[in-house]
């Protein structure tokens, strides 16, 4: 049995998947590891690239080729459950690692620090098509130790491609995980409910800002198929996840979650304003303001003023006589 399983989900990553796989194969370790790839019925040649690599590395690569598109979270869960290692590392098919010692560094840390359940590291963020230099995800001054409370209040403690965690921290998955619209933040919450998170400030990977954001595109397609609205979908998903967390933790951390809730309402207000749906923009702006003044001001004064403007604009726009 391998000590580490690398869990890689992919969909329409023909241009990037080889680089992702090669960055796994270059790892220098003193333990066995496997690469488990969940290929979600891509419409390009991603599958062919994966099969080519699998045939060359039969002892290292295990490919799960879906006959129909499952969607991001079901594909992730299926791939995750196929991982047998004591530790699991995440890497999506359009990201890649840059440090050949990445796995060893993170696993060694977890082996020597049993009160930690997960580790992350700094990464470069590469914006597709941009000529700008890559920026760092969290930077070198990000706090070294994060707790459950930190992850609930401030969100992700690291890019997906930086995460290595103990399998026993999340398996078996709780039933609610199967209903999630997205899995990154909840996975970190599950892990930090069992131990602390350690952050390496050194850059050991590259997170590619999604060219077409395949995971989001899948979610939007599925919403359209159900006749659901797609405006502000990521932020609506955040609100759904917050509700799940509240129920899971029996509302012990509701106040901490207000930070994420307020930002979700803030972003929804802006998206509806941009789409000139002023009644809905006002609804979310008022929700954000209500939470701010009901708890304490997470948003800057500038953003609070922006929300008030959205409310006033919505009243003005809806009071205009029809043309």
Please place each PLM-identified region on the residue numbering.
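Cell-envelope/extracellular polymer assembly enzymes that use nucleotide-activated donors
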Residues: 2-5, 34, 186
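Conserved donor NDP-sugar-binding/catalytic core segment of glycosyltransferases
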Residues: 101-134
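Short aromatic/hydrophobic "clamp" motif used to bind/position activated sugar donors
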Residues: 88
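A conserved acidic beta->alpha catalytic loop
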Residues: 39-48, 68, 92
């Amino acid at each position: 049995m391998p000590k580490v399983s690398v869990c890689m989900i992919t969909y329409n990553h023909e241009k990037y998947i080889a680089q992702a796989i090669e960055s796994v194969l270059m790892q220098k370790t003193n333990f066995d590891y496997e690469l488990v790839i969940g290929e979600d019925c891509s419409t390009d040649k991603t599958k062919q690239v994966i099969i080519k690599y699998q045939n060359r590395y039969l002892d290292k690569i295990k490919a799960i080729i879906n006959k129909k598109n499952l969607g991001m979270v079901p594909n992730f869960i299926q791939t995750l459950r196929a991982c047998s290692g004591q530790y699991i590392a995440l890497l999506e098919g359009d990201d890649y690692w840059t440090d050949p010692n990445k796995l060893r560094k993170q696993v060694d840390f977890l082996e020597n620090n049993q009160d930690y359940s997960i580790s992350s590291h700094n990464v470069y963020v590469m914006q597709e098509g941009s000529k700008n230099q890559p920026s760092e995800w969290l930077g070198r001054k990000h706090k070294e130790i994060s707790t459950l409370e930190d992850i609930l209040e401030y969100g992700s403690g690291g890019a997906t491609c930086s995460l290595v965690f103990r399998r026993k921290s999340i398996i078996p998955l709780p039933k609610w995980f199967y209903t999630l619209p997205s899995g990154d933040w909840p996975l970190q919450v599950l892990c930090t409910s069992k131990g602390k998170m350690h952050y390496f400030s050194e850059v050991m990977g590259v997170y590619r800002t999604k060219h077409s954001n395949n995971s989001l595109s899948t979610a939007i397609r599925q919403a359209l198929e159900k006749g659901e609205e797609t405006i502000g979908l990521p932020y609506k998903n955040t609100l759904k996840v917050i509700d799940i967390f509240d129920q899971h933790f029996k509302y012990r951390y509701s106040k901490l979650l207000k930070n994420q809730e307020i930002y979700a309402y803030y972003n929804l207000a802006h998206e509806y304003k941009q789409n000139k749906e002023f009644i809905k923009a006002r609804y979310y702006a008022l929700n954000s303001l209500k939470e701010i003044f009901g708890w304490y001001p997470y948003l800057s004064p500038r953003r609070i003023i922006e929300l008030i403007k959205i409310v006033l604009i919505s009243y003005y726009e809806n009071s205009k006589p029809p043309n």
